[in-house]
């Protein structure tokens, strides 16, 4: 269970809720989960087994954002029956089975109901080929039937190859399909005065929109090395996702509305990451990383960068551990981000097209005392550069006016912070 309240400093929910005295918001969440696992392994054939997984949850969220209400309830049931065995030898393994998913959604947004029941039975088959520890392939296919969207297939392929000792190459690819939950996945946009428009009109489908469908593929290369007789690892990742359909969240057509609609045009993401880990001297580890995140989507015909997503990020970490002492220092570079269009607002409520880039730093030192019942004492600081976004809430002086928008967050919201504490473990 979780309950959160926010808003203006003077906001008092007992007096100001659903009034225009002071702006406030509240989110109350209750969630209950149940699960069970049953399995049987054949005594004479350890490679052969049955498994049955069962789970369910009930999730309820009651929330308000100023004068806007959003209440949602989800009941979920999941069943998965798995049979595992081999084909000839243990180098050829397979898993197959049946699954069943039931989801009941009851959503109420601004007094409009968006209810649906999704029933998705399916079957799957997965084959694994292993050749020693150097090469293996996992190929899978599942076919499901969604009562709202019909049949769909999701193939998947994973290959792992170790051509030489210390070098590992992984390749993967496949297809995915899902139903977007447009309100629950975009709560931040509700903390604004934007008019919400759902442009779909497909009867019998969730919000009148099509499911999201994407193909993705990627490669990962890990290389172990030694430098000055000390071990290290270099890791390179590249992944690409191409959407056949996507529920587009468009906040660019107007600063005073958000449109949800099916993709018409291109949408893709390219993710490249380079990381190096190395013990540069005794007990001192260095980690360096760089990530390129190229994400673009067609918004009303214009192919644009995804808003509020940094294309470039870099990271460096130093970690030292000796005789109970631990020191950790991290510096992060966050590149510039595209800010959604605000040009049809009055001048005082317009934002620049891009955010500035910025650097943040965190540090912590800790000392462990005792062995039988260790006590950790720590001292640290976050955001050492004291860089934070000034005036993150657009039109904060008129929270119930037409230009109010608290969703344009591109940087830290709090300045430099120091903390201290201790951890005591009882074995």
Which residue stretches match the model-derived regions?
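Repeated loop/turn-to-beta-strand initiation elements of outer-membrane beta-barrel proteins
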Residues: 2-3, 44-50, 89-94, 134-137, ...
């Amino acid at each position: 269970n979780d309950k959160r309240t926010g808003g203006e400093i003077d906001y008092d929910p007992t007096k100001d809720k659903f009034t225009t005295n002071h702006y406030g918001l509240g989110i109350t969440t209750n969630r209950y989960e149940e699960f069970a696992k049953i399995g049987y392994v054949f005594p004479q054939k350890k490679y052969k087994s049955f498994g049955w997984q069962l789970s369910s949850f009930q999730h309820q969220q009651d929330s308000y954002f100023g004068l806007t209400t959003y209440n949602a309830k989800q009941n979920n049931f999941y069943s998965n029956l798995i049979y595992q065995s081999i084909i000839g030898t243990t180098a050829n393994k397979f898993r197959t089975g049946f699954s069943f998913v039931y989801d009941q959604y009851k959503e109420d947004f601004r007094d409009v109901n968006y209810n649906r029941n999704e029933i998705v039975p399916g079957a799957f088959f997965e084959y694994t080929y292993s050749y020693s520890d150097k090469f293996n392939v996992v190929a899978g296919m599942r076919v499901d039937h969604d009562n709202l969207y019909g049949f769909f297939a999701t193939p998947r392929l994973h290959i792992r190859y170790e051509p030489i000792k210390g070098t590992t190459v992984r390749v993967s690819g496949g297809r995915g399909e899902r139903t977007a939950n447009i309100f629950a996945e975009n709560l931040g946009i509700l903390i604004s005065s934007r008019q919400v428009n759902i442009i779909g009109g497909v009867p019998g489908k969730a919000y009148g929109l099509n499911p999201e469908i994407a193909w993705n593929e990627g490669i990962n290369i890990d290389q172990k090395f030694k430098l000055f007789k000390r071990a290290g690892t270099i890791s390179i990742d590249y992944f690409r996702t191409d959407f056949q359909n996507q529920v587009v969240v468009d906040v660019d057509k107007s600063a005073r509305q958000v449109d949800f609609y099916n993709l018409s045009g291109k949408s893709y993401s390219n993710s490249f990451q380079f990381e190096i880990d190395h013990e540069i001297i005794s007990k001192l580890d260095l980690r360096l990383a760089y990530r390129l995140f190229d994400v673009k989507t067609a918004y009303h015909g214009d192919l644009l960068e995804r808003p509020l997503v940094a294309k470039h990020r870099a990271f460096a970490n130093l970690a030292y551990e000796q005789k109970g002492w631990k020191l950790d220092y991290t510096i992060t570079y966050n590149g510039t981000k595209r800010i959604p269009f605000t040009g049809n607002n009055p001048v005082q409520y317009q934002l620049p097209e891009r955010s500035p880039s910025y650097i943040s730093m965190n540090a912590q030192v800790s000392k462990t005392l005792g062995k039988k019942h260790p006590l950790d004492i720590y001292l640290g600081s976050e955001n050492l550069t004291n860089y934070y976004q000034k005036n993150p809430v657009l039109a904060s002086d008129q929270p119930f006016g037409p230009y109010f928008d608290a969703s344009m967050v591109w940087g830290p919201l709090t300045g430099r912070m120091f903390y201290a504490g201790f951890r005591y473990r009882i074995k």
